[in-house]
UniProtKB/Swiss-Prot annotation:
Function (record text): Catalyzes the transfer of the AMP portion of ATP to flavin mononucleotide (FMN) to produce flavin adenine dinucleotide (FAD) coenzyme.
Gene Ontology biological process: FAD biosynthetic process; FMN metabolic process
Disulphide bond pairs: none
Binding site for ATP: 14-15, 19-22, 100
The protein's Enzyme Commission number: 2.7.7.2
Quaternary structure note: Homodimer.
Pathway membership, UniProt: Cofactor biosynthesis; FAD biosynthesis; FAD from FMN: step 1/1
Annotated family: Belongs to the archaeal FAD synthase family.
Protein name: FAD synthase
Organism whose genome encodes this protein: Thermococcus sibiricus (strain DSM 12597 / MM 739)
Gene that encodes it: ribL
Pfam families from the UniProt entry: CTP_transf_like
Reactions accelerated catalytically: FMN + ATP + H(+) = FAD + diphosphate
C-alpha cells in the first residue's frame, strides 16, 4: 500500500499585529492542502517595502504564527528579497497568495518555472473585510484614538 503524498501549501507575508483577516486567509490557505508553511517577512524586507519597521519583530511574528492550529511550520524569510531558494527547499505543491499581495501571478509562475519550482499559484480573495482586517488601519485607529 502506497502512502498518499501530503499536499504542501506555502504562503508568505508580514503578519504584523495578527488580525481576523489574517486568520481567515490562513484558514483558506490550509484548506488547499494538508500542510501549511508560512514564510514570515524579514524585518529588513518589511522596512524596505512598507517604509517602516514592523511593530513586532520577525521572531515574535513567527512565534505567534507557530501557535496557530492551522499553521504547521513557520520559516523566516531572507532580508530584502523574496527567496526562491527557501521556496525551493520547502518544495510546495501550492503557493497561496493573499488578496493584498501585489504579485503579477503570470510573472511569478514564469519565475518559478525558471527556478524549477513546480507549484500551482492560487490567489485567495478577501474572505473578511472590515476596518480592523488590515494592519495599517489598526495602526491608524490606534493613533487617532490614543495619540491626539
Amino acid at each position: 500500500m502506497t502512502k498518499k503524498k501530503k499536499i504542501r501549501v506555502v504562503t508568505g507575508g508580514v503578519f504584523d499585529i495578527l488580525h481576523v483577516g489574517h486568520i481567515h486567509f490562513l484558514k483558506q490557505a490550509k484548506e488547499l492542502g494538508d500542510e501549511l508553511v508560512v514564510i514570515v517577512a524579514h524585518d529588513k524586507t518589511v522596512e524596505e517595502r512598507k517604509g517602516r519597521r514592523p511593530i513586532n519583530s520577525m521572531y515574535e511574528r513567527a512565534e505567534v504564527l507557530k501557535a496557530l492550529k492551522m499553521v504547521d511550520e513557520v520559516v523566516i524569510g531572507e532580508p530584502n528579497c523574496i527567496s526562491f531558494e527557501i521556496v525551493k527547499q520547502l518544495n510546495p505543491d501550492i503557493i497561496a497568495l493573499g488578496p493584498d499581495q501585489n504579485f503579477d501571478v503570470s510573472a511569478l509562475k514564469e519565475e518559478l518555472k525558471k527556478k524549477n519550482i513546480n507549484a500551482e499559484v492560487i490567489r485567495i480573495p478577501y474572505a473578511y473585510k472590515s476596518d480592523v482586517a488590515k494592519t495599517s488601519k489598526i495602526i491608524q485607529k490606534i493613533v487617532e484614538t490614543f495619540c491626539e
